[in-house]
């Protein structure tokens, strides 16, 4: 085992003589953080939390548009950069395409028809043939029979008149799916003796 005298020179002679030199500290000129003078010009630190929405821009070169995904957001007072040269090859080869002027849509305007204000809408609503609710004189026979049969159903007080409202044909005399009027004034009874599309269940499963 080595004696104490062999390693005495390592620590005893260097106490209080440690190296304290740092050439240039990262934050300033001096490495002595307690006794050094403050620098004359403070560092220009950008305050990211400060709002400049209602104030004039301090730095013209500083752009405050934020790029997120495919959208670009602009703050008040900032203009979109339309003067930039296009980057795509089509615009470089053929030039900028001419875009027609399209006025902005007024989203606050009502789209409900005002008959008194517009003569065209008044003419569309009341045509000369006396038709109403979008029905015109040039409809197919199938659709006209459907509309006439449903109107007959409304006129007759809910009692179905003879005829199929879909095809316009009359009912067969042996059909069992029909409405029987109630004798005592209660609700009508609908007889439905139909076979389901897959047939009746056998009850085995």
From Swiss-Prot:
Ranges of Low complexity composition bias in the record: 136-149
Functional summary from the UniProt entry: Binds to all microtubule populations.
UniProt GO molecular function: microtubule binding; structural constituent of cytoskeleton
Stated name of the protein: Microtubule-associated protein Jupiter
Polar residues bias spans: 124-135, 181-191
Signal peptide as annotated in the record: none
Pfam families per UniProt: JUPITER
Lineage: Eukaryota, Metazoa, Ecdysozoa, Arthropoda, Hexapoda
Keywords: Cytoplasm, Cytoskeleton, Microtubule, Nucleus, Phosphoprotein
One GO-annotated biological process of the protein: positive regulation of microtubule polymerization
PANTHER family: GEO05313P1, MICROTUBULE-ASSOCIATED PROTEIN JUPITER
Post-translational modification Phosphoserine, affected residues: 30, 138, 149
Post-translational modification Phosphothreonine, affected residues: 41, 98, 102
Organism whose genome encodes this protein: Drosophila virilis (Fruit fly)
Family in the record: Belongs to the MAP Jupiter family.
Cellular localization per UniProt: Nucleus; Cytoplasm; Cytoplasm, Cytoskeleton; Cytoplasm, Cytoskeleton, Spindle
InterPro entries noted in UniProt: JUPITER
Ranges where the record places region Disordered: 124-205
């Amino acid at each position: 085992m080595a004696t104490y005298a062999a390693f005495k020179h390592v620590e005893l002679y260097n106490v209080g003589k440690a190296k304290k030199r740092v050439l240039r500290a990262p934050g300033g000129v001096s490495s002595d953080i307690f006794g050094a003078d403050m620098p004359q010009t403070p560092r220009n630190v950008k305050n990211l939390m400060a709002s400049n929405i209602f104030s004039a821009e301090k730095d013209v070169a500083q752009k405050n548009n934020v790029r997120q995904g495919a959208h670009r957001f602009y703050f008040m007072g900032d203009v979109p950069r339309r003067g930039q040269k296009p980057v795509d090859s089509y615009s470089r080869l053929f030039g900028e395409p001419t875009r027609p002027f399209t006025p902005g849509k007024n989203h606050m305007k009502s789209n409900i028809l005002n008959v008194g204000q517009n003569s065209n809408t008044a003419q569309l609503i009341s045509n000369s043939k006396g038709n109403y609710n979008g029905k015109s004189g040039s409809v197919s026979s199938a659709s006209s029979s459907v509309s006439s049969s449903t109107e007959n159903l409304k006129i007759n007080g809910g009692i179905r008149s003879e005829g199929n409202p879909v095809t316009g044909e009359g009912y067969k005399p042996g059909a069992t799916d029909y409405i029987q009027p109630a004798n005592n004034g209660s609700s009508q009874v609908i007889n439905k003796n139909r076979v389901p599309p897959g047939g009746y269940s056998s009850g085995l499963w």
